[in-house]
Each structure stands twice: as structure tokens, then as C-alpha cells.
Amino acid sequence: MKLYHYSSIKIENIDMNKCDGFWMTTIAPTETKLLMEIGADGLEFCHVIEFDDSGEALMNGSNEDIADQLESEKADYIQNNYDGFSDYATCNTDLIKIVEVIAL
């Protein structure tokens, strides 16, 4: 599985002590405020990944363990639906990473 930072540098190590799960979503170019807040303003559609260290897995069991996902998922990216993404991203922009930009 390929995970990338804004600079497209591959993430080699994930600190499991700081991260209990992750989510991925797609941001449309019309979401200008959110794109600006995560440093992606001016992009087309982009996939983004959120490394979640909020302990949500303990609260509602909705997160998957990163190590398990990386071992079991062979696709270039994992698509999860996370309807609270926008609110979460605006408060935790340091946890949002661009994975893939999709040309229109």
C-alpha cells in the first residue's frame, strides 16, 4: 500500500504509539476552505488520508489497526467512508496527508 505525505515522500514507518487507525476520503475542488486548511488549495480532486490518534477505536470500534490494514490490503489505497472527516480535518490538519491527486 502506498501512503504519501504532501511532498509525495513515501511513509516508511508508522509510529503505532501515536496512531490507532486511519481513514481515507476524497475532497472535491469545490471544498476550497478544507483544501486550503490541509495545504492542498488549487488541486483537483484529491484522496487524503487521516492518521487517527484520538482513541476512537476504544470508543466505538470504528477504526482498523494500521498494521493489520497494511498487511491485508493490497490496493494502492484503502477507501473508508468517514462522514465526520471535514469537522475532524479542520481541527487536526497535521494529521491529514495527501495520498493521490486525481486529474479531472
Residue ranges and their predicted role:
Residues L34-M36:
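Compact nucleic-acid interaction/catalytic patches
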Residues K2-G21, T25-A28, I38-L104:
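Active-site and NAD+-binding cores of ADP-ribose-processing enzymes
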